[in-house]
A protein has these predicted regions:
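N-terminal leader segment of winged-helix/HTH proteins
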Residues: 1-46
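Linker/hinge segments immediately adjacent to helix-turn-helix/homeobox DNA-binding domains
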Residues: 22-37, 53, 59-63, 136, ...
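N-terminal helix-turn-helix DNA-binding core of bacterial DNA-binding proteins
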Residues: 39-80
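Canonical helix-turn-helix DNA-binding module
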Residues: 66-110
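Amphipathic alpha-helical dimerization/coiled-coil segments
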Residues: 123-143
């Protein structure tokens, strides 16, 4: 994939992270349902769902920028406890969204990445979203 595309995707993620209202509407009503992830969980706590998405965004943005994201990066950046981060990452692993791989430079460290299947679906979704945003911008420019 072109680096430019990953940069644009990471910028879209940054915007979504900063705009919680858009994030909650789009992802809770569209993307979660589209992947049937929410239905796999016995409890659909709003706080858990938001934290899951914050972790997914953080990992995805890091992956798109070529960064190696660890559990400690997650809990330090998102301001949650280490145990909460570990539990959420484990649940997201069980759902097939995240996976842990050993860091090639430091075998003691686990790097958190999006699974291939989820990454492909997420990239498709972000690309569709980018296309929709472009259409909105283009239609406003014509006026």
């Amino acid at each position: 994939e072109p680096i430019e595309s990953n940069f644009v995707r990471s910028e879209i993620l940054r915007i979504l992270i900063e705009s919680k209202n858009i994030q909650n509407f789009i992802f809770n009503n569209y993307f979660f349902d589209a992947l049937d992830i929410a239905n796999k969980k016995e409890t659909k706590s709003s706080n858990s769902t938001i934290l899951f998405w914050e972790i997914i965004y953080f990992v995805a943005e890091g992956n798109f920028r070529g960064a190696k994201v660890s559990v400690s990066d997650i809990y330090l950046s998102l301001g949650v406890s280490k145990s909460t981060a570990i539990r959420c990452v484990a649940e997201l692993e069980d759902l097939g969204i995240l996976e842990k791989v050993r860091d090639s430079n430091d075998r003691r460290r686990a790097v958190i990445t999006l699974t291939g299947k989820f990454r492909n679906e997420f990239v498709d979704f972000l690309d569709k979203m980018l296309h929709q945003l472009k259409n909105v911008v283009d239609s406003n420019a014509v006026r």
